[in-house]
Amino acid sequence: MGIVGVGIDLVSIPDFAEQVDQPGTVFAETFTPGERRDASDKSSSAARHLAARWAAKEAVIKAWSGSRFAQRPVLPEDIHRDIEVVTDMWGRPRVRLTGAIAEYLADVTIHVSLTHEGDTAAAVAILEAP
């Protein structure tokens, strides 16, 4: 297997928190019910955890885009909702894909790491293919 894409994203948690629950925001339909439930179950701010998940979605998109260097981008409009960050019972993240992006990346393993420190959330995604 080899690395075919790397993506990273940083999110300002205070800025994100202001936007995430505003009526008409794109974020209302960006997160799956599971992502919203997981974030609300945490002891700290839900916005903090959703910001890290947003960063993960963006990192996956950047890694995928980078893997298509010199090729036309193929990004479905509702791509963020098709990238879901799930966690196991110990809080370790994994990416679950649905829709068109799942078809494009069917043979790709996605490694993801999320973090938040102070006012910043971040994520790194690495795409690995056979």
UniProtKB/Swiss-Prot annotation:
Gene3D superfamilies: 4'-phosphopantetheinyl transferase domain (3.90.470.20). Binds 2 Mg(2+) per subunit. Its main location: cytoplasm. Transmembrane segments: none annotated. CoA binds at R53, T115, H116. GO terms for molecular function: holo-[acyl-carrier-protein] synthase activity; magnesium ion binding. Mg(2+) 2 binds at H116. Optimum pH is between 4.4 and 6.0. Pfam families: ACPS. GO terms for cellular component: cytoplasm. GO terms for biological process: fatty acid biosynthetic process. Was identified as a high-confidence drug target. NCBIfam families: pantethn_trn (TIGR00556), PRK00070.3-1 (NF000831). Apo-AcpS adopts different conformations depending upon the pH conditions of the crystallization solution. Belongs to the P-Pant transferase superfamily. AcpS family. HAMAP family: AcpS (MF_00101). This is Holo-[acyl-carrier-protein] synthase. The gene is acpS.
